[in-house]
Amino acid sequence: MNNPEFMEKNIAKFIALGTVPNVNNAPHFLIKLFDKSKILNLIPVKNFLTLPKEVGQVFVPLCTSKAKFLCNSILSLAFSGTHETGRIDYDRLGKNIYLYEPGGTSLQNMKHWIQIYKAKRAQKYDYGLVENLKHYGQTTPPVYDLKKMKGYSIPSLMTISDADPFANPQDTLDFVDNIENKKVVNILSLTNYNHIDYFWADSAVQEIFPKVMNFLDE
C-alpha cells in the first residue's frame, strides 16, 4: 500500500475472496480473545494452525465418522464465529475440506492482525521499541499512508459478506473510499457466507466462481 508504483507494475488484476484490508470492525470472538489473553505470545512455534498433511489424513476418517458433527462445529466456530455450518455441505465435502482446513498462517501474521485490531489503524508489524528502531529507524511501527491509494488503478474484485466475522463489509468499504476511481473496484456483496464459504460452499459454483472467471476474461 505504500508503493503504488510497484503494485501497478507487477499486478495485472487483484481478486480478494473475503477481503480483509483491516479489522477495525471485525467482530470475531477469536480476535478479541487473542487481543485480551496474549495467548499468541505463549505459542513456541512460528506457525499458527498449519498442520502437516499427515495430520489432515488422520482428521479425514475421524471427521467423516460419527464424530463429524464435532469437527464441523469446531471449523464453523473458527471461521464463522457460530456453530452454524453456513453454506458448506460437510457430508459431501468433509473428506476434501479436512485435508486442507484449517489452512493456517504464520504466527507473526496473526500477531500483526491483532496489533492492527488493537491500534485501529493499518500499520506495519510492531517489534517492540528496540527492534522497531532497528527495522524502521523509529520506536513505533510506521502507519500505512492510505492517501497513496488515491490513484489506485488495478482492476479489482472484492467479495464481502454479512456473515464473515473476519472480513467486515464496512472495513472494505472504508478502504475503497481511499480510491478516487472507484470504477476499477468491483465489489461482490454476498449473503450468509463465512470466511471459507467463498471457496467451499456449493453455491459458490453459481454465485462466485463464474464472476471470478468473467472478471479474469475481461
Residue spans of the language-model regions?
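Hydrophobic/aromatic beta-strand patches that form the interior of the parallel beta-sheet core
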Residues: I15, L157-T159, N186-L188
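Short beta-strand/loop motif that positions the catalytic acidic residue
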Residues: Y152-S153, L157-I160, D164
